[in-house]
Structures are given as C-alpha cells and as structure tokens.
C-alpha cells in the first residue's frame, strides 16, 4: 500500500478491473454511439420513415441466474429495448413503441460471459495504432530507401516511398504504384493547391511531364488513372459513379479511414491541427507526409520505432462488442428496409414492433463469442488461471499478426514494455512473444494506450504524487530503476542510483531522479509475481513457472506456502473463488450450501459453490470459514474456495525434499516420492467428469430412455432408476450403464428369433426391434455420481428432445506418471513410489517426502529454488511464513543468502535441531539411507519448497489399444487416445528394433498389428481355431499404396518374391 498526495492509500488495482471497465464503457458509450449512427429508413416512395431513438435504450436485468445458465446450457444475457418511431408522412402521424431488438451477453463478477452454458473470456488485442510511420530499409545496392506507411483504423496499409531520383510514389498494391500528384488530385486537390501547400515544390515539379499534367488535369482524369493502377485494368475506362463507388468501398474506406485514434496520431506526427471529428485521410495529410518523407531523404527528421508501445493500441472488449453491435444494426437496417417494402407491396400497415426482428443481434453476438479468435473458453483449472487468462494481451487475431509470419523483432522485449507488459510471462511455442500478459499495475487509457504508474519525486506541497504515464511520456523523465519499498521522502537514498532515460540505462545522482516505480512487482504479471526469489532464476525457467502455476490442480487439502511474495491474497480475492461479506451483520446459519447473514433488519442468503465442475474437470467448491453467531464486517472472508486457505492462494503443498540421486530413479527430471504422499492424501485431488447423451428422432421413430435393456447383464444396470437414469450417489465402475437408451431400427424377417416369429404368426404381436445405445462409463471413469441433469427442450412436431448429463466425482491420489513441479520451472514425472521406511531420513528421524535430481539446478540456472527450499525448512521449524519481495539485493549485497542463513541459524538454536544449520556446509545436512541406516557419503540439501501437482495426469494420458478403427486409405490404426488409436512405430523405432535383432517382433508390428489386411484376418481365424500363425506372403497395404502413388506419377514399380529353397522368382501384382 502506498500513500498518495492526498493522504489516501494506493493499493494493487483489481486484477479484473480492465475487463469491467471495458464492458462498462461499451454499455455507457458504445451502445449510444452505434445507435446514433443508425440512419432513418424510408421506403421507395418516401411515404414511411422508421427511426430509432438512441436516448431511450434500456437493458433489462437477466431473467436467469448464472448457475442456472451454466447447468442448463443457456446464455446469461440481458434484453435490449429501444424506442422506435414510425412516421407516415401523408398524415404526419408518428407511432412510437418500445421494441425488443435482441439480447446482449452480460459480463459477470469474474469478468467473463456465459454463452450456451460455457464461460468465455474476450482477451485484449494489441495492434499497430492507426497513423503514419516512417522507416528506412536497405535495397539490394545497400542504399537506404525511406518509406512512410499509413495504417487505417481498419488495418489497411498504404505506403509512400521516395526513389533515388527523389520522386514520390504511393503504392496502392504490391506491384502497382502511382505518383503522389495523381493520388492528391484523385482526393480532390488541384496542382496549384498542391504546390502552395508543400515545402519542396521544386521536387514535385521536377518530374512533372506533359503526360503527368494530363493525368492530373482534372479530378476525373486522376480518378481514372488511379483506378487503372488499383484495379489493374487495361485500356481506357470511362468515368462513372459506379467506378467512384467501387474505389470508395475497396480503397478509400479501408485504407483512408483513420478513426479517432488515427487522427490524433496523424496530427501529432505531422504537426497538424485538423479537428478530431475529421477521421478520414485528407489531401493535406498526404502533402505533409510527403514533406516529411523528403526531409528524411535529406537527413532531417526522425524515424519511427513501430514496436514501441506508443505506436500500439489496445483493442479491448468494449471495441470488439461495439463493432459487433454496429454490424448487427447494419443487418437490422437491411432487414427493416426489406420488411417495409414488403408491407407496402402487400398493402399492410406496419408497426415498429413488426418491422424489427430480435434474432439478428442475438445471433451476431452468439457467433462472435463462439467463433471469434479473441473469444476463448475460460481456463478454470485453478483460481489463478482465471485471472491470468483475463489479463492476456494478444497480437494475433483479425487485423493482427500470425504465428508463422511474425519476426523475431516483433516478439522480442522492448524497453517500453517495462511496467506495462510482463517481460517474462508469455506463451511457449510458435506464439512466443505474441501473447503476453499485462503488468500488475497497468491500466488502459482513453486512447487505447497502456499506462503505468510512477511516483513523482517532488516536494510534499505539490498535488498528486502518483502519475499514470502512457508509453513515450516516461522517456522524458529520469526514472529510478532500483529503488526501495519505502516512499517516504525523508528516507535518505543512495547518492548514486541506476535510472532509465530514453530507453537507456544510466547511473545518476539521486537529486536528478524525477520518477520512481511504486511497487517492486510493477514490471511483472500476476503469475510471475507469485515466484519468490525470481531474481535468482533464468528468465526461461521463470516463464515455465508462470505457465505451470496455471496448470496446478486444486488439492483436497490445500496449504499456504511458507515462502511467498505477498501477492497471494490479492490473487485469491480477485479470482472470485472466495465468498466475501457485502455488509456488516451476524451469521445466523451456515452449511455447505449457503450462509445466512442478518444485518440492518434484513437477512441475506449467500449461496456457496459445492462440487462445481470446471472446463478442465477440476472440482470447484467453497468451505465456510465463519461460525453461527459470529459478527462479521464488510469485506470479511466468509468462505474459502478451491486452492485458497485463509483468503490466500494455495496451489500446492510444502513437502520435505532432498536434492540427491537415488539409484537412478530420478534421472533426467524423474522424481522419487514416498508412499506417505499417497496414504495421507497429501497430493490427492478431486475431479468431476461430465458424460452426456441426447435422444434423437430416427426414421423408425424416437429413441427411448428406459431401464429395460435386453441382452445386458443385470449388474451393469443395477444403478438405474425406473426411468433408466443412474441414481445420484451411486458408485459406478467402467462398463456400467449411466443412461439406458434404445434406438429403433429396421430388422429383416430372417433375423427374427424363432419365438418372435411364433408370436407374430399366432397372436399377431409386432415384436419391436431396437438397438441398445446406452451411455456407459468409459475406461478410467469410475467414481461417485454426484449430479444428474435431465434437460428437455421444446422441439417440433410434438417431440421434445431430451439431453441427460451425468456428473461423476473422482478421487485421484498421486501415482507413477503424474507430473509435479515447483515454482521455479523445476518439473518432473513421478518414476517410483517408495515405502516410507526405504526413503532417506533426517537426523531427527523424519523421512524425506520427495527426491529431486541435483543436476537439474546448475545447468538450468534456477537457483531460486535453493533459497526457497532452505527458507521453507526454517519456516517449518520456526512455524513462520515469509513474504519476500523480488530483487532484494538492492538493499545490500547477498541479501537473499543472508536472510536464509540467518533464519536457518535461528531455527537450529530455538528448536534444538543443530543439523538445520551446519557452518561447514550451510543449508545441507547429513542424512541416512532408509534401507541400510548408513549416512550418505556427502551432505545433502534438504528443505521444504512449495510443490504443485499439475493437470497432466497419467489417468488422462495412459492408453492401450486392443481393437479399434483403421484409416481408410492406409489401413493403419488411427492416432490418438480418443479414437482408440495405436502407437506409431516410426523410422527410428524400426532402427532400434533392427539393432537388437528382434526380427519377429518387428515383422509383427509392421504387418499383423498394422496394415496387412489378410494377415490380420488370418490372426483372428488362427486364434479361434488354434495353431500357428502363418507368415504373410504378400506386401502390406502401405506398400501397395506407395505403388499406386508412383503409378499416378507414371512410374511403374514391380516386386518379386524369391523362394528360399530353389531361388525361383515368383512375380505378383502389388
């Protein structure tokens, strides 16, 4: 918390605040702006006029609750009503009605939207800001070529370039360019105006020939010349209105509309004073841009850095929703126009309500949330994941970059990112550097820029002391880089401090400093701010840690970290997983479903989340932390959520770890664990799987949900009720029926059983033939049924389709194959679970819980884990928790090492454990082999770091194929666990098998188990009858496919079989 100039307190802003502000700006301003753009609609004879009144729009409170929208697959939306008027000019009567024009998805308290029952988030997009940018490139001869790129608000680009002869060209396409005089004339300027408004008229006149004069003799000639170059049309086209309209739609509207931000940038770069409401590119802009380009040619002026954040803008959720609302109104305008014409043609009297359809706005937003690249399914693995996802900023998407074409310079860290975009937290893989995360204190300004706060170094009498500066503005100040937490001006700083000035790092006297950062974590994202001792880690490992914390599974019994950074509480508060008291009062009732609070004569019911499934199948829940009769204050925590303890983020567990090799079981990042982690449920987590089935109408009739399923064993349907649906609370195993369903089908006369034919012949009873299509528990799906949802939707022709969802809760202990990780990029796979008596143990008799490989530390340069490990041990012995700010070496040299050693020394003295700190090898200790009782040869580093269990679990990945589908072309098994696919034996695997000489196993893998059709059939027959499986004598299907492919290239390939006995050649067709 920081003191501002008015005596108030400045804290970390709400981490979801950017999403809330964007949506509120759309509701308050965006809707009104687009409704004002809605033009009056008239019929052909101009007898009827329709218009919307933007001042009187109204949003209705959603009719359903968030929880019901999730469970029933509905959209949590608000209905929009606008007053509309229909004027009949003959009688001058106006009929006004409040009409419903559609539903708009509403943002909830998490900063997300619920569309069709799915939580979705609209992430911010960072784009090149509209305006003009000058740059220089070297041509093939090493000569600098200067260009000016004009970027429109739509993302379209036009380039001005100057050649060796100082001629100015405007490039309208990749291959076509025209003279700047032709472009200016086509935009409405004559030659005299051009000469009078440029600084270098002699340069423009130097290449003006008779042919050029004819082209710019009139506006029509200039437009025709421009159209020929732009549309690549030969001959002499004739001037017409349609030609001008085509140019307007395809060029001027897409490349010359600057928008509000573009006009501001253009005025600032070219030193113009054109009004802000004039958002189109003007001839004056072109001429001023030409002057500046000529000046750059002669060494005057400066080039632009297009990767600087002052040349970027943020396209927030408000801009995206406003664009889609404008698109829906354009569609509505066309629909109303057609409806008016149809009503007049059929001589009907229209009303405003009859003219407007609400489906256009609703379907526009549903398609946006479902199909737009920037609208993504909210990642809800743990509370931290939700916050980080909402604070992402992407360079991808419409109008942005692509992962294939983005250069290294665009992906790299820029000095202007400091305090605005985290230099650590980004995606791994092809999108590295293109998807970033906003810094913890950043905010979005009015012009779409990222603003970072700074503390102003001045006298106490000056006004506000915390300034929010946009990119570029802070470069004019001396900004102290390494400064302490205290902002009291009376504290004497060092005489010389490091500082930033104009993207350079300097060392200056303290008196010259103008600004300083307000928080040690100001430069990092929320995920990176949770890493203690981050300054001792390599940046690549810090990046991995930021990403892996988002993959941590909420555990059954969470635990606060011993060593943290202090940001854990803010992350938990803004995640929405906690229940917070909205007013003072007294708790009168509490259970697992709700908390009742009485205050001011009112009783408020606060519902709690109980066993809610996230989209990553993790279990979200809330546990009450207050008692009946307890008095509470506003803002007090009433209930903890998943992965939170006492209002702090708790993603993992602090366990006893030793860094040592152990019989090769922790080779190459493998991890050895004790069985007590399994039996004591240390890393046990709950997961909820959702299984769904839907009834359809077939040509033979509707499908039926029932518990009378023929040809199924009784124990498979033991859990079904009378309706054929599994009972809530049942324990189910793989293969059990969750929902019994029969599908009618056509059966031939010959396929009836004898008793069925007898019933038909004697009694005339029609035997129904149905196919069993039940919903069954898949392999690895055992668990407890915690919820069953039966959803009926209204269908046509008197049939209501049914959708049944079954939720199964699974308890998963940690096992071999699961992935665990620390907070420093140190990750590994469980390789073996040892009995606790075989694990290494300490001098006080405690056995180690987990063994890491020490070779994983020096090469990866993530030494922060060593500090956390040792300080965690001291904290567990002293029963203390530490919150460490990053870059503490600015206070004194070796500050991290000193605090760790001092705490270990204090722990060894106060707890009578002298082994905790041994001066010969501080931080290490002599430990014993649990199998023999002997001490290990060398002292071992032991401690209590914070370990996370990640979502990558072996239960979701392990797979074996007994039988399955084959690809149609290659006849080889499909790929992937979901398709019951096989494991590919590639080229290198074949080499390995050849190296060991296992010829029969290799032949089996390449024929029987792969794509030899006849051999597969013979294996089945031989298995049933018994005997020896014969060796395949012809080529497999993949070889036959290769032959056919070569034949398509007119290459004939034949093969021969040579007998081993008499070497006779037997030729067969491939």
From Swiss-Prot:
Catalytic reactions of this protein: RNA(n) + a ribonucleoside 5'-triphosphate = RNA(n+1) + diphosphate
Keywords per UniProt: DNA-directed RNA polymerase, Nucleotidyltransferase, Plastid, Transcription, Transferase
Gene Ontology molecular function terms on file: DNA binding; DNA-directed RNA polymerase activity; ribonucleoside binding
Localization in the cell: Plastid
Entry-linked Pfam families: RNA_pol_Rpb2_1 (PF04563), RNA_pol_Rpb2_2 (PF04561), RNA_pol_Rpb2_3 (PF04565), RNA_pol_Rpb2_6 (PF00562), RNA_pol_Rpb2_7 (PF04560)
Family matches, as PROSITE patterns: RNA_POL_BETA
GO BP field: DNA-templated transcription
Signal peptide, first to last residue: none
Keyword Ligase: no
Alphabetized InterPro entries for the sequence: DNA-dir_RNA_pol_bsu_ext_1_sf (IPR042107), DNA-dir_RNA_pol_su2 (IPR015712), DNA-dir_RNAP_su2_dom (IPR007120), DNA-dir_RNAP_su2_hyb_sf (IPR037033), RNA_pol_bsu_bac (IPR010243), RNA_pol_bsu_CS (IPR007121), RNA_pol_bsu_protrusion (IPR007644), RNA_pol_Rpb2_2 (IPR007642)
Top-level taxon in the UniProt lineage: Eukaryota
A GO cellular component entry from the record: DNA-directed RNA polymerase complex
EC number: 2.7.7.6
PANTHER family, per the entry: DNA-DIRECTED RNA POLYMERASE I SUBUNIT 2
Record-stated family: Belongs to the RNA polymerase beta chain family.
Reported function: DNA-dependent RNA polymerase catalyzes the transcription of DNA into RNA using the four ribonucleoside triphosphates as substrates.
Subunit: In plastids the minimal PEP RNA polymerase catalytic core is composed of four subunits: alpha, beta, beta', and beta''. When a (nuclear-encoded) sigma factor is associated with the core the holoenzyme is formed, which can initiate transcription.
Name under which the protein is recorded: DNA-directed RNA polymerase subunit beta
Organism this protein belongs to: Cuscuta exaltata (Tall dodder)
Taxonomic lineage from the root: Eukaryota, Viridiplantae, Streptophyta, Embryophyta, Tracheophyta
Gene: rpoB
């Amino acid at each position: 918390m920081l003191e501002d100039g008015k005596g108030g307190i400045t804290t970390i802003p709400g981490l979801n605040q950017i999403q809330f502000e964007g949506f509120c700006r759309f509701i308050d301003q965006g809707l009104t702006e687009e409704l004002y753009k809605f033009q009056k609609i008239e019929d052909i004879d101009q007898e009827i006029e329709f218009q919307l009144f933007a001042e009187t729009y109204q949003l209705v409170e959603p009719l359903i609750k968030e929880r019901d929208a999730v469970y029933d697959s509905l959209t949590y939306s608000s209905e929009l009503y606008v007053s509309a008027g229909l004027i009949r000019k003959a009688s001058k009567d106006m009929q006004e009605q409040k009409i419903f024009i559609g539903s708009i998805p509403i943002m909830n308290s998490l900063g997300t939207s619920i569309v069709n029952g799915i939580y979705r988030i609209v992430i911010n997009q960072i784009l090149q800001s509209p305006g003009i940018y000058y740059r220089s490139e070297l041509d093939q001869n090493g000569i600098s070529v200067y260009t000016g790129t004009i970027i429109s608000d739509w993302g379209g680009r036009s380039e001005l370039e100057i050649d060796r002869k100082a001629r100015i060209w405007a490039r309208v396409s990749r291959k076509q360019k025209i003279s700047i005089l032709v472009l200016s004339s086509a935009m409405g300027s004559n030659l005299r105006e051009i000469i009078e408004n440029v600084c270098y008229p002699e340069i423009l006149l130097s290449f003006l020939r008779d042919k050029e004069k004819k082209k710019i003799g009139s506006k029509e000639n200039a437009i025709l010349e421009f159209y020929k170059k732009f549309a690549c049309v030969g001959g002499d086209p004739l001037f017409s209105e349609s030609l001008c309209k085509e140019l307007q739609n395809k060029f001027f509207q897409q490349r010359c509309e600057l928008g509000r931000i573009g006009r501001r940038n253009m005025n600032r770069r070219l030193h113009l004073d054109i009004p802000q409401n004039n958002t189109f590119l003007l001839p004056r802009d072109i001429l001023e841009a030409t002057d500046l380009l000529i000046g750059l040619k002669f060494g005057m002026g400066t080039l632009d850095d297009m990767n600087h954040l002052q040349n970027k803008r943020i396209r927030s959720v408000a801009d995206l929703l406003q664009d889609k609302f404008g698109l829906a109104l354009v569609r509505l305008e066309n629909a109303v126009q057609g409806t008016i014409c149809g009503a007049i043609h059929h001589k009907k009297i229209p009303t405003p309500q009859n003219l407007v359809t609400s489906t256009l706005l609703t379907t526009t937003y549903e398609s946006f949330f479902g199909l737009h690249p920037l609208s993504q399914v909210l990642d809800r693995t743990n509370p931290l994941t939700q916050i980080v996802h909402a604070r992402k900023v992407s360079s991808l998407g419409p109008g942005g970059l692509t992962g294939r074409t983005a250069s290294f310079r665009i992906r790299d860290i820029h000095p202007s990112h400091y305090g605005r975009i985290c230099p650590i937290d980004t995606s791994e893989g092809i999108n590295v550097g293109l998807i970033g995360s906003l810094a913890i204190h950043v905010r979005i300004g009015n012009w779409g820029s990222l603003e970072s706060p700074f503390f102003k170094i001045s006298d106490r009498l000056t006004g506000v002391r915390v300034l929010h500066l946009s990119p570029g503005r802070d470069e004019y100040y001396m900004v102290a880089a390494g400064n302490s937490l205290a902002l009291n001006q009376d504290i004497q700083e060092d005489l010389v401090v490091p500082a930033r000035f104009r993207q350079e790092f300097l060392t200056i006297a303290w008196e010259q400093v103008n600004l300083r950062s307000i928080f040690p974590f100001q430069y990092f994202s929320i995920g990176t701010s949770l890493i203690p001792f981050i300054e001792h880690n390599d940046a690549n490992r810090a990046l991995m840690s930021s990403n892996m914390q988002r993959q941590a599974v909420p555990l059954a019994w969470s635990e606060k970290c011993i060593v943290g950074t202090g940001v854990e509480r803010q992350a938990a508060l803004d995640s929405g997983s906690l229940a917070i008291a909205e007013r003072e009062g007294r708790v009168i009732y509490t259970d697992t479903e709700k908390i009742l609070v009485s205050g001011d004569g009112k009783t408020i019911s606060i519902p709690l989340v109980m066993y809610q499934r996230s989209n990553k199948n993790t279990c979200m829940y809330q546990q009450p932390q207050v008692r009946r009769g307890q008095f509470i204050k506003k803002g007090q925590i009433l209930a903890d959520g998943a992965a939170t303890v006492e209002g702090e983020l708790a993603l993992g567990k602090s366990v006893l770890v030793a860094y040592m090799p152990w019989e090769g079981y922790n080779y190459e990042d493998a991890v050895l664990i004790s069985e007590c982690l399994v039996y004591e449920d240390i890393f046990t987590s709950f997961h909820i799987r959702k299984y769904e089935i839907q009834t359809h109408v077939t040509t033979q009739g509707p499908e039926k949900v029932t518990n009378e399923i023929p040809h199924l064993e009784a124990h498979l349907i033991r859990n079904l009720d009378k309706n054929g649906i599994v009972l809530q609370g049942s324990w189910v195993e793989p293969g059990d029926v969750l929902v019994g369903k029969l599908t009618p089908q056509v059966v031939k006369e010959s396929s009836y059983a004898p008793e069925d034919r007898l019933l038909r012949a004697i009694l005339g009873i029609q035997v129904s033939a149905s196919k069993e299509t039940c919903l069954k528990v898949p392999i690895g799906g055992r668990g407890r049924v915690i919820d069953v949802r039966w959803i009926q939707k209204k269908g046509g022709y008197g049939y209501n389709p049914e959708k049944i969802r079954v939720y199964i809760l699974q308890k998963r202990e940690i096992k071999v194959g699961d992935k665990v990780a620390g907070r420093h990029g140190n990750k590994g796979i469980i390789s073996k679970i040892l009995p606790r008596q075989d694990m290494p143990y300490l001098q006080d008799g405690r056995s180690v819980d987990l063994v890491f490989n020490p070779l994983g530390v020096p090469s990866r340069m993530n030494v922060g884990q060593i500090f956390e490990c040792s300080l965690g041990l001291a904290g567990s012995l002293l029963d203390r928790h530490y919150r460490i700010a990053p870059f503490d070496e600015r206070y004194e040299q070796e500050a991290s090492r000193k605090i760790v050693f001092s705490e270990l020394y204090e722990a060894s003295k106060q707890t009578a454990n002298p082994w905790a700190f041994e001066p010969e090898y501080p931080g290490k200790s002599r430990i014993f082999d649990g199998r023999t009782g002997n001490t290990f040869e060398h002292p071992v580093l032991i401690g209590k770091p914070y370990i996370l269990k990640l979502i990558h679990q072996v239960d979701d990945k392990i797979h074996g194929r007994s039988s399955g589908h084959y690809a149609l072309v290659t006849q080889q098994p499909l790929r992937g666990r979901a398709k019951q696919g096989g494991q590919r034996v590639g080229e290198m695997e074949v080499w390995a098998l050849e190296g060991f000489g296992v010829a029969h196993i290799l032949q089996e893998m390449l024929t029987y188990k792969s794509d030899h059709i006849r051999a597969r059939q013979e294996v089945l027959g031989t298995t049933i009858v018994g005997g020896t499986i014969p060796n395949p004598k012809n080529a497999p299907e993949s070889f036959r496919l290769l032959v056919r492919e070569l034949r398509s290239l007119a290459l004939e390939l034949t093969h021969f079989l040579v007998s081993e006995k008499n070497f006779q050649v037997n030729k067969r067709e491939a």
